[in-house]
Amino acid sequence: MQKIQSNQIQEQDLTPELKKWLYASGSLTQQLTDLADGLFTVEPIQEKYQRMSFMDSRWMRMPAYHVAWVRESLLYGCEQQPWVKAKSIFPVLSLQKKARIFKHIGKKPIGRFLFQRTTPLCERRVIRLEEGWTRQSCYTWHGCKFIVQETFLASFEQYIQHHSHSI
């Protein structure tokens, strides 16, 4: 998987519409729900334990290659094609605390819990993956650190270009 760090991103490579989404704060769940007039679904693809990458471990200030529970899912708005591919990385240490609720949410979006009555601390970086522009957020929520990665797929870029909604 090829990554391009945000300091290497050329402004002309990024549409103004998508740039707003990549750098928006708050709940992507709520923003997508609003864009899709209330239609929003989560389709879990895979959930498993795996070792964190060196870069993710370092970003979260965790021991190198720490074990994490990883949840991958597709997020759908008002179209049949998925808009976002999401990947959440919860270190085992966070699962021993309040973040353990995220392991059992099934088809519910993480954002519904993450932003409920709280605004977690967030460090963000924007990268380009093969599948599309991606924002990675390292959250600190009730003393738990975890990463939420959201890749905006081509179908989403096409939708926002044709429907010029703003967030």
Curated annotation (Swiss-Prot):
GO BP annotations, alphabetical order: pyruvate biosynthetic process; ubiquinone biosynthetic process
Main localization category: cytoplasm
Molecular-function GO terms, alphabetical: chorismate lyase activity
Pathway assignment: Cofactor biosynthesis; ubiquinone biosynthesis
Annotated binding of substrate, by residue: R71, I110, E150
EC number: 4.1.3.40
GO cellular component term, pick one: cytosol
Catalytic activity: chorismate = 4-hydroxybenzoate + pyruvate
InterPro entries: Chorismate--pyruvate_lyase, Chorismate_lyase_/UTRA_dom_sf
Alphabetically ordered keywords of this record: Cytoplasm, Lyase, Pyruvate, Ubiquinone biosynthesis
Pfam families: Chor_lyase
Subcellular location: Cytoplasm
Highest taxon, organism lineage: Bacteria
Purpose: Removes the pyruvyl group from chorismate, with concomitant aromatization of the ring, to provide 4-hydroxybenzoate (4HB) for the ubiquinone pathway.
Family stated for the protein in its record: Belongs to the UbiC family.
Protein name: Probable chorismate pyruvate-lyase
Gene: ubiC
